[in-house]
């Protein structure tokens, strides 16, 4: 990420998902945004952090940011927040469920 970028600086000043979508010219899928808003924004931030923007023009940075938002939204079109496990609480819950699982092969039959 390139913090000196006017595009990225402007993104940090926006306060709502709707403002971010409008700034990047992305039409939100309303039902997805309404049910997964925080998850989309967190995933968008993760995609931005992992994107190398070194040497890109301002237009290139804008396009990469836009692509990151489109990708983040798309993740929740075909999936759910629970399946995507964006937040630690979901990861922890999945680990607990896995630990509670007892496979049939571990059970022993005791004859009396």
UniProtKB/Swiss-Prot annotation:
Name of this protein: Nitrogenase-stabilizing/protective protein NifW
Biological process, per Gene Ontology: nitrogen fixation
Keyword match Isomerase: no
Function in brief: May protect the nitrogenase Fe-Mo protein from oxidative damage.
A Pfam cross-reference name: NifW
Subunit structure comment from the entry: Homotrimer; associates with NifD.
Keyword list, A-Z: Nitrogen fixation
Family: Belongs to the NifW family.
């Amino acid at each position: 990420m390139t913090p000196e970028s006017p595009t990225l600086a402007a993104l940090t000043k926006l306060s709502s998902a709707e403002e971010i979508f409008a700034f990047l010219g992305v039409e939100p899928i309303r039902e997805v945004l309404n049910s997964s808003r925080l998850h989309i924004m967190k995933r968008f931030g993760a995609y931005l952090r992992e994107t190398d923007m070194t040497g890109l023009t301002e237009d290139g940075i804008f396009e990469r940011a836009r692509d990151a938002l489109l990708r983040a939204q798309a993740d929740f079109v075909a999936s759910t927040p629970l399946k995507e496990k964006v937040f630690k609480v979901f990861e922890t819950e999945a680990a607990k469920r896995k630990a509670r699982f007892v496979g049939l092969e571990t059970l022993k039959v005791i004859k009396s």
